[in-house]
Regions:
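N-terminal low-complexity, acidic/polar interaction/targeting segments
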Residues: 2-165
Length: 165
């Protein structure tokens, strides 16, 4: 039997976005981030003053010639759940994935980081808490296949956090 519980969260129409290659966050997972670039330190500062929400997304075909990389269309909105500033000015952040989003358009601004208008409509199911019985052997096979796929692609995944789910 599956039961669905909708989490109450106000989803913003525009979000700051952190494009990070070889990095994926999924809804309901928590990942560590080491923030050291000044523009993303500014982004975290602004986010901490408001709703603590930022978007994570993969850049497309990143190369050294692109000053502003093109992005994939789908990313994940995350909430900062832990924050620590280091002595050398870096931020150690834990980000909890909430819901996937689709980029609508980039918002022009004077900020050093990028902001986008986004749409969550196709991903509301990410906010549901599913309580479902799965066989442990099914999960082992799924994780084995996922690990293999992500290792081939060079993605960094917090497997310990995923296994808690």
């Amino acid at each position: 039997m599956i039961s669905y519980i909708m989490k109450k969260i106000e989803l913003p129409k525009k979000i700051p976005v952190f494009p990070l290659s070889n990095f994926i966050i999924f809804p309901k997972t928590t990942v560590p981030l080491n923030i050291f670039e000044p523009r993303y330190i500014d982004m975290i500062n602004e986010s901490m003053k408001s709703n603590k929400l930022i978007g994570m997304i993969q850049p497309r075909n990143l190369n050294n010639e692109q000053l502003i990389p093109k992005l994939h269309n789908i990313g994940c909105l995350g909430k900062i759940v832990s924050f620590k500033e280091t002595e050398d000015g870096r931020y150690l952040v834990e980000l909890k994935g909430l819901i996937r989003f689709e980029i609508i358009e980039e918002i022009k601004s004077d900020k050093k980081y990028r902001e986008f208008e986004v749409n969550f409509q196709n991903f509301y199911q990410d906010l549901n808490e599913k309580k479902e019985e799965l066989k442990f052997s099914d999960l082992e096979l799924i994780f084995k296949d996922l690990k293999s796929l992500f290792e081939k692609r060079g993605f960094i995944i917090n497997w310990k956090e995923l296994e808690k789910q």
